[in-house]
Amino acid sequence: MPFSHTKIVGPAGRYGARYGMGLRRKVTAIEVKQRGKHRCPSCRSLVRLERIAFGIWRCPKCGFTFAGGAWTPQTIMGKALAPEELKEVEAQKAKWKEAVK
């Protein structure tokens, strides 16, 4: 395995000593979140979604293309209002109510 110059700084290692550490830390945080595993809204599988363009994402498993955030597939506001998430929460609440009775 070749020597890696980005072991500590992560994806921002490609910038070398340029742009300052603060900006490189921000870039690293964004890119780690962007390239991590996310749940597909269609097939619900946990995969690395492909970013096709600014805010457009595709699931490599099922091929579902959807609009999301610029840097992450689902924004905080979108996650709060996603119908799939609300259905899961309602189902969980119903299970808890039945368990209490």
Swiss-Prot record:
Binding-site list for Zn(2+): C40, C43, C59, C62
Any Pfam family hit: Ribosomal_L37ae
UniProt cofactor(s): Zn(2+)
SUPFAM superfamilies: Zn-binding ribosomal proteins (SSF57829)
Zinc fingers, C4-type class: 40-62
InterPro entries cross-referenced by the UniProt entry: Ribosomal_eL37/eL43, Ribosomal_eL43, Ribosomal_protein_eL43, Ribosomal_zn-bd
A GO cellular-component term linked to this record: ribonucleoprotein complex
Gene Ontology molecular-function annotations: large ribosomal subunit rRNA binding; structural constituent of ribosome; zinc ion binding
Co-factor: note: Binds 1 zinc ion per subunit.
Source domain of life: Archaea
Gene3D superfamilies associated with the record: 2.20.25.30
Keywords (A to Z) from UniProt: Metal-binding, Ribonucleoprotein, Ribosomal protein, RNA-binding, rRNA-binding, Zinc, Zinc-finger
GO biological process: translation
Signal peptide positions (record): none
Family: Belongs to the eukaryotic ribosomal protein eL43 family. Putative zinc-binding subfamily.
Biological role stated in the UniProt entry: Binds to the 23S rRNA.
HAMAP family: Ribosomal_eL43 (MF_00327)
PANTHER family from the UniProt entry: 60S RIBOSOMAL PROTEIN L37A, LARGE RIBOSOMAL SUBUNIT PROTEIN EL43
Subunit structure: Part of the 50S ribosomal subunit.
Name recorded for this polypeptide: Large ribosomal subunit protein eL43
Native organism taxonomy: Archaea, Thermoproteota, Thermoprotei, Thermoproteales, Thermoproteaceae
Gene, per the UniProt record: rpl37ae
